[in-house]
Amino acid sequence: MESHLEGKAGEVLDLSFAEVMDKEGNFYTENYRSAKARYHYICRDGKQTYKPKLTFWGFRYIRVNAFPGGIDKVTLDAFTAIAVHSDMKRTGYLSCSNNSLNKLFSNIIWGQKGNFVDVPTDCPQRDERLGWTGDAQVFIRTACLNYDAEKFYTKWLADL
C-alpha cells in the first residue's frame, strides 16, 4: 500500500486491513489470528509518499482510522494498492465466453501472486507466512502453467 498525503508534522495516517466483513458489515479480522494488519504513519510537513518496505498485507477492504486533516479529507487517489509477488514471467492465460470461469481464473492468478513472495504460502494475510510443503506441492502444476515458476520452486526447494 502506497499513500500520497499532504499533512502537518505529527498528523497520523492509520489504516486497518481485512479480507471479509461480518454479517453486520463490520471489519472481521479474527481469521488473521494475531496479525495486526495495521498501517500507522506519522507525517512530516508537506506533501509526502509513504510505502512500507518491510511488510505487506493481504486484504480486500481498508478502514481509515485516522487521516491527516481529518477523515473527511480522505480521497481514493491518496492510496495505491500494490501487488507484491515474486518476479515470474506469466505463461498461462484463459479467456472464454463464460464470465464466471474468467473470474475464477483471474482469482487463481491473483491468489498465486499473493502467495508467491519468496516462498509459496497458503495465505498472505495471517500472522504466519510460511512455505508449507503440502500447499506448494498440490498447487505446483497450476503454478507452473500460470507462470514460469521453475526458478521460484528451485530456489525454495534448495532453501528447505
Listing of model-derived features with the role each one plays in the protein:
Residues R126-D127, F139:
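Hydrophobic, small-residue-rich membrane helices and short re-entrant helix-turn-helix hairpins
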Residues V138-A149:
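Well-ordered alpha-helical scaffold segments within catalytic/enzyme domains
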Residues M1-Q125, G134-D135, A149-L160:
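Extracellular/oxidizing-compartment recognition motifs
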